[in-house]
Amino acid sequence: MDVHDVKLTISAVAAAQYPEDGHPEIAFLGRSNVGKSSLINKLIQRKAMARTSGVPGKTQTLNFYDLDSRLFFVDVPGYGYAKVSKTARAKFAAMIETYLTTRQPLRGVVLLVDSRHEPTADDISMYQYLKYYQLRTLVVATKIDKTPKSKRLHVAKQIKQRLDLNQTDDVILFSATTGEGYEAVWSWLEQTAGLEGR
């Protein structure tokens, strides 16, 4: 999909603030600093549309990015950051749960994991949560350019085993630096959002 116009439509903290356009939505989930904003920026070919930060836990709202009035990317607050207060973590969790379990236009979820490390207990819990609610999920292993090519198949296999990936879900190795995995991720997004050939 060639993206021409991108705008941050809404930064929401409650369901009443969600867009009412009815366009399909894809949510991006992952631990703090896993590379969500970098992935989104690469996919939409913008250097700084989604705000990247060296500070974990920076995203504290559901950020809805409108792509050509056809599709929303939803940047979800990162999980697993210990320095965020328990109160803030509980607030984030409730906000994310409400969105994932009640949002009609949501077509699928991109779950990001760091390819340099095994999926964490938080990653495993999140994947199990997504499967419990039968949400279509793509696992994207970020920062794959940091891993030697000879070890990448092993990385993908390790992620599949650790998450106990079901047969309908897949792992795509991705690098925001080199663009590896870009076309494969977009292919999944278009198919999942029902935008193939449109």
Curated annotation (Swiss-Prot):
Keyword Nucleotide-binding in record: yes
Cross-referenced SUPFAM superfamilies: P-loop containing nucleoside triphosphate hydrolases
Residues that bind GTP: 30-37, 57-61, 75-78, 142-145, 174-176
Residue sites binding Mg(2+) per the record: S37, T59
Swiss-Prot/TrEMBL cofactor(s): Mg(2+)
GO cellular component: cytosol
Family, as annotated: Belongs to the TRAFAC class TrmE-Era-EngA-EngB-Septin-like GTPase superfamily. EngB GTPase family.
Family annotation (HAMAP family): GTPase_EngB (MF_00321)
Name of this protein: Probable GTP-binding protein EngB
Species per Swiss-Prot/TrEMBL record: Lacticaseibacillus paracasei (strain ATCC 334 / BCRC 17002 / CCUG 31169 / CIP 107868 / KCTC 3260 / NRRL B-441)
